């Protein structure tokens, strides 16, 4: 493993080409959700599994934890990355990450399904296109 110093160009990747991204990271915030659904660990596990399938992803493992007095965290480990959900039923709020890698992934379908399943009356969605080093333009290939 090579260690790079701050400001050093990653010369091994300086081919000047830029390929299209293959990874998307969706950051979804759900507001005014059904508080009972946000506190139902079994329900949340079920919808994460279904969301992964809608995104064309393969679930490798699904773990969850119910907190006292309320709230759940659940994470679906995917062959293509992950989907996670953290809930605050007392605030009718949930934070969701959907990170997928690959050409045939449809994380937007998973996002829409989760919005509907949790009955969110409002939501915020940010999409980040993740780029492996070979897809990053030469001018931004410096280590910060």
Model features per residue range: what roles?
Residues 1-144:
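Polybasic/polar functional segments that serve as interface/processing modules
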């Amino acid at each position: 493993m090579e260690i790079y110093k701050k400001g050093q160009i990653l010369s091994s990747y300086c081919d000047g080409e830029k390929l299209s991204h293959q990874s998307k990271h969706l950051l979804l915030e759900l507001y005014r959700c059904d508080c009972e659904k946000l506190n139902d660990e079994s329900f949340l596990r079920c919808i994460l599994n279904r969301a992964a399938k809608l995104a064309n992803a393969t679930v490798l493992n699904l773990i969850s934890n119910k907190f006292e007095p309320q709230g759940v965290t659940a994470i679906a480990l995917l062959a293509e990355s992950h989907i996670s959900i953290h809930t605050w039923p007392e605030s009718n709020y949930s934070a969701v990450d959907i990170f997928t890698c690959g050409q045939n992934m449809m994380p937007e379908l998973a996002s829409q399904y989760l919005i509907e399943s949790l009955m969110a009356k409002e939501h915020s969605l940010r999409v980040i296109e993740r780029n492996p080093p070979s897809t990053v333009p030469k001018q931004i290939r410096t280590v910060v």
